[in-house]
């Protein structure tokens, strides 16, 4: 959604136009929109459903009621695979893929980890039997509370193997430990989200893209370690 689309890009790194990229990846787009006005609406009303269309439908009820259901199985890897580091293997890590960004596995490999990427249907018993040095729970889409099976598997892993959850993985860990999550009125989006270390004096500038948060008051088995400096919401928990 843009105010004005450039049809003749000139950057030396550009391989194709925005229009060609969107068509190649089957992504809808629209130009000529007053994006500042849209921003003001979202600022006051919060996150809402929207549609790109050539005419306003007579009945908006289906649009208002629309919601994405069970998205994690749609974006997970269908089969396990392993990525090796360039040098010696220092650790073996299982990365449970709930919609993982490639950079997570890439950064683990840089640190000497052999990363086995597992589908979201992975069983806790199989993970423990494989003897991994640690388990990484990836980012992913949707309402964390809908992932009942994944939460149960994480609960079986708690206290038995070192774990680190990021984004959805962090939220699922909190749910597995008895906490709860809720939808943010204003999701955290962008590359400049400030996060405070509650046990120190540092504030980190982070990249975020999530619309749900862990309820800090429900984290009984852990301690809130990081909080968003803008709205005070939970950003990280130590268990």
What residue ranges belong to the model's regions?
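Hydrophobic residues at beta-strand termini and immediately following loops
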Residues: 96, 118, 184, 227, ...
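Short amphipathic alpha-helical segments
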Residues: 43, 106-109, 147-150, 175-179, ...
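Cysteine-nucleophile active-site neighborhood
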Residues: 134, 139-205, 211-213
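RNA-binding accessory domains that recognize and position tRNA/RNA substrates
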Residues: 1-125, 129-130, 144
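Hydrophobic beta-strand scaffold residues
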Residues: 28-29, 115, 163, 181, ...
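Beta-strand-turn-beta hairpins that frame and shape the catalytic cleft
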Residues: 87-93, 200-203, 239
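Catalytic beta-strand/loop cores that center a nucleophilic Ser/Cys/Thr
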Residues: 202-239
């Amino acid at each position: 959604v843009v105010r004005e689309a450039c049809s003749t890009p000139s950057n030396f790194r550009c391989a194709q136009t925005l229009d060609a990229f969107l068509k190649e990846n089957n992504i809808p787009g629209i130009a000529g929109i007053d994006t500042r006005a849209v921003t003001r609406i979202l600022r006051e009303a919060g996150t809402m459903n929207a549609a790109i269309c050539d005419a306003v439908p007579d009945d908006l009820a289906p649009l208002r009621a629309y919601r994405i259901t069970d998205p994690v199985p749609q974006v997970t890897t269908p089969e396990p695979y392993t990525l090796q580091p360039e040098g010696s293997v220092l650790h073996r890590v299982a990365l449970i893929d709930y919609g993982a960004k490639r950079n997570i596995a890439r950064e683990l490999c840089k640190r000497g980890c052999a990363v086995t990427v597992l589908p979201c249907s992975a069983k806790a018993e199989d993970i423990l039997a494989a003897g991994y040095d640690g388990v990484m729970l990836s980012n992913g889409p949707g309402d964390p509370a809908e992932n009942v099976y994944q939460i149960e598997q994480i609960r079986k892993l708690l206290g038995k193997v070192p774990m680190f959850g990021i984004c959805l993985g962090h939220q699922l860990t909190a749910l597995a430990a008895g906490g709860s999550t809720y939808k943010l009125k204003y999701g955290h989006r962008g590359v400049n989200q400030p996060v405070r270390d509650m046990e120190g004096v540092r504030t980190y500038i982070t990249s975020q893209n999530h619309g749900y948060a862990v309820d800090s008051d429900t984290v009984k088995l852990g301690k809130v370690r990081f909080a968003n400096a803008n709205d005070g919401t939970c950003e990280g928990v130590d268990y």
